Regions:
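N-terminal Rossmann-like dinucleotide-binding module
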Residues: 2-59
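Nucleotide donor/acceptor-binding cores
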Residues: 6-8, 102, 129, 159
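NAD(P)-dependent dehydrogenases' Rossmann-like dinucleotide-binding region
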Residues: 18, 153-166
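Short, well-ordered amphipathic alpha-helices
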Residues: 20-31, 92-96, 145-150
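Short acidic low-complexity segments
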Residues: 34-35, 63-74
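Conserved acidic residues
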Residues: 42, 62, 75-77, 102, ...
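Short, conserved SAM-binding/catalytic segment
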Residues: 54-61, 119, 123-124
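Beta-strand-loop-alpha-helix segment that lines the small-molecule cofactor/substrate pocket
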Residues: 78, 84, 89-138, 153
Length: 166
């Protein structure tokens, strides 16, 4: 089955700021592209039930699930890992174990340590699943402007740059 005719059933692991960005983008695809596969916003998973319920209602997800329910859900064939950085490794491990998940998108950072990265490489190579890593904010105008300002040297010689974008 090719991508144009396959129904994409998406599950989000995470319901915070970057998840809102992805939900908006997915819901907007049909306005920008003439040939978009059928996309179902199947389930959203987050630690707090109240926030995942609100997120599901706001963005049109069918279900709001706890992590164990999410991992067991066989209707999800595409997982977006959008939670806090510290849980990316754990969430990737869980997503790779989902029999129905064919595709996994992982927001940066991939993991928190070299050891996690090495474990991830081994686990991922055994599954044959498609995994993509992304960094969406890098291309936003505000981040590009902030980085350009940093590079001017007007801030001296910074050793760390922590940008919050809301």
């Amino acid at each position: 089955m090719n991508m144009a005719s396959e129904k994409i059933s998406i599950g989000f692991l995470g319901a915070g700021g970057i998840a809102r960005t992805h939900a908006f983008a997915i819901n907007s695809l049909k306005y920008f592209y003439s040939e978009v596969p059928e996309i179902e916003l199947e389930a959203v998973c987050s630690t707090r039930k109240e926030s995942r319920d609100a997120f599901a209602a706001k963005f049109g997800f069918k279900k709001s699930l706890a992590i164990d329910e999410f991992i067991a859900d066989t209707t999800i064939n595409t997982v977006l890992i959008l939670g806090p950085n510290k849980v990316h490794f754990e969430h990737l491990q869980l997503a790779l174990e989902m029999p129905s998940a064919k595709r996994i998108y992982l927001e940066k950072p991939v993991c928190s340590s070299l050891e996690e990265e090495q474990q991830m490489a081994v686990i991922a190579s055994k599954t044959g699943k498609q995994i993509q890593v992304g960094f969406q904010y890098l291309q936003t105008a505000s981040v590009r402007e902030a980085l350009a300002f940093w590079k001017t040297g007007k801030l001296g010689n910074p050793i760390h740059f922590d940008l919050k974008y809301y």
